[in-house]
């Protein structure tokens, strides 16, 4: 069994390396076009991912016609393909090239600089929206390196390869399994911490708050960190602007923290506010969110399953 596992891991790593190196050898525009093409092909294939996406879109947009939902789901797959193409280019990216490729939102920049001036930590409240791998990478290219929470991949060799790319310009990955102490240190030292806030979680590590009008089990960790460190929480994401042919690093004003003196209530209220901020960004760029994730999988006790 162990031998089979080692062989399987080696094959997975070899395949991942071939794909990334093959795309990485292409000019950026070609690699991205190939990636988008792969995404379009994946959209056409029947399977659980498409069914999950369709179900999620029914929940989020109950009044939307089927044709428009199909357009958004196709965009989701295309965005994933774009992510693959762009990620393959990061090993050879330079700060100069990235600055030409990215437009930074002045709102997000202003609040980031203000927090830095006041020596306050910053939490980038983000999610699987647009090209999230480029998001953290792009900030480090602008000389704002950050730490970010990750769940390591099961294949250690692929994880090492991916982490080398992610951390080229000074970013630092923090394993979610042991994140609390390191995350607190980053924020208390005035650093920036990126957290993907839009994943389904379990009740022991989250709370149920509305997301697109339906309760979703959402991580309580962001609220806990923000309340303990008085960090500035900035909703932000990296999305493709088709008209400008550039990426736009969207930034909203910080989410104001609520403090009532009731810890449990503060966690729930602030988590709900963070989820609402994430929802607003998804509504702005609905064809670039990860609709194929089972966001509403965990249900309150006694409620029927969704998927």
What residues fall within each predicted segment?
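Membrane-anchoring hydrophobic helices of lipid-metabolizing enzymes
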Residues: 1-126, 159-163, 170
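Non-catalytic C-terminal accessory region of glycerolipid acyltransferases
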Residues: 2-7, 26, 36-38, 49, ...
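Short, flexible loop segments at the rims of nucleotide/cofactor-binding pockets, characterized by
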Residues: 98-103, 151, 168-174, 212-213, ...
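A conditional alpha-helix N-cap/helix-loop micro-motif detector
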Residues: 102-105, 129, 155, 173-176, ...
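Short amphipathic alpha-helical segments and helix-helix/interface helices
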Residues: 109-113, 136, 162-163, 183-184, ...
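Catalytic core of membrane glycerolipid acyltransferases/transacylases, capturing the structured
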Residues: 116-177, 200-207
